[in-house]
Amino acid sequence: MAVPETRPNHTIYINNLNEKIKKDELKKSLYAIFSQFGQILDILVSRSLKMRGQAFVIFKEVSSATNALRSMQGFPFYDKPMRIQYAKTDSDIIAKMKGTFVERDRKREKRKPKSQETPATKKAVQGGGATPVVGAVQGPVPGMPPMTQAPRIMHHMPGQPPYMPPPGMIPPPGLAPGQIPPGAMPPQQLMPGQMPPAQPLSENPPNHILFLTNLPEETNELMLSMLFNQFPGFKEVRLVPGRHDIAFVEFDNEVQAGAARDALQGFKITQNNAMKISFAKK
């Protein structure tokens, strides 16, 4: 059954997520698979009973949210297909950027006696009862720590150029070899002062195994798997014990490995870490 879409929004609402995954791990994984579509301002995840299996991803650009929704709809994430739709209202962070943010006194509204409700008020409340999710987009989720406590990988990246997709571009669910996933940072989009990873000085001959360097401390096997498993032929990620900054990614053949290397070369996992990819030595 198709998921009904509302008006395009900077924020996408995701449900049917695996409830057994820890909150911090879920945030990192969501960032890993959605950052390819554009700049992420925030990710909201709560472990409260009411909000389990749900999350909100807030993009800087509406076009990024649209591409993410259409490309990742039904994507198997922790063995469950994601259900994605636009959030029904702007999140607080977007409302503040637009200048439309209105502070809400939640405590006072909560204590409001029922006897003061007029028939018109009751009707309005009942009419909005079908969309309990909206409140979570508009402000902090109850029981959730402030986003300042989120992993560093989730933070807004000042100065990073936002992803601007070509007009009318809608990425397909699967990527053919050689296609660049939307939002993957090409070398020319690195931060000022950083040298673009043009052509390595000593390029190894093609190999079905890729060698990754300049990875941030937060990197784990799952995050890299989420990035690379969108490419045909992906087999596995291998980390090096005692080294968080390097990893190996194996594909079925050299052509498939080369397509993934070209697409994700220079991908910025964090503000200061542009991933460098080369063929592993044989």
From Swiss-Prot:
Any GO MF annotation of the entry: U1 snRNP binding
Pfam families registered for this protein in UniProt: RRM_1 (PF00076)
GO BP terms, alphabetized: mRNA splicing, via spliceosome
First-listed, main subcellular location of the protein, grouped into a coarse class: nucleus
Modified residues (N-acetylalanine): 2
UniProt GO cellular component terms: nucleoplasm; nucleus; spliceosomal complex; U1 snRNP; U4/U6 x U5 tri-snRNP complex
Entry-linked SMART domains: RRM
Subcellular location(s) per record: Nucleus
Residues bearing the modification N6-acetyllysine: 60
Key words, A-Z: Acetylation, Methylation, mRNA processing, mRNA splicing, Nucleus, Phosphoprotein, Repeat, Ribonucleoprotein, RNA-binding, Spliceosome
Chain segments carrying region Disordered: 100-132
InterPro entries documented for this protein: Nucleotide-bd_a/b_plait_sf, RBD_domain_sf, RRM_dom, U1A_RRM1, U1A_RRM2
Phosphothreonine: residues carrying this PTM: 131
Highest taxon of the lineage: Eukaryota
Residues annotated with Omega-N-methylarginine modification: 152
Residue stretches making up the RRM domain: 10-89, 208-282
Record's subunit section: U1 snRNP is composed of the 7 core Sm proteins SNRPB, SNRPD1, SNRPD2, SNRPD3, SNRPE, SNRPF and SNRPG that assemble in a heptameric protein ring on the Sm site of the small nuclear RNA to form the core snRNP, and at least three U1 snRNP-specific proteins SNRNP70/U1-70K, SNRPA/U1-A and SNRPC/U1-C. Interacts with SFPQ; component of a snRNP-free complex with SFPQ. Interacts with IVNS1ABP (via BACK domain); the interaction is indirect.
Family under the similarity heading: Belongs to the RRM U1 A/B'' family.
Function: Component of the spliceosomal U1 snRNP, which is essential for recognition of the pre-mRNA 5' splice-site and the subsequent assembly of the spliceosome. U1 snRNP is the first snRNP to interact with pre-mRNA. This interaction is required for the subsequent binding of U2 snRNP and the U4/U6/U5 tri-snRNP. SNRPA binds stem loop II of U1 snRNA. In a snRNP-free form (SF-A) may be involved in coupled pre-mRNA splicing and polyadenylation process. May bind preferentially to the 5'-UGCAC-3' motif on RNAs.
Name of the protein: U1 small nuclear ribonucleoprotein A
Organism: Homo sapiens
Species lineage: Eukaryota, Metazoa, Chordata, Craniata, Vertebrata
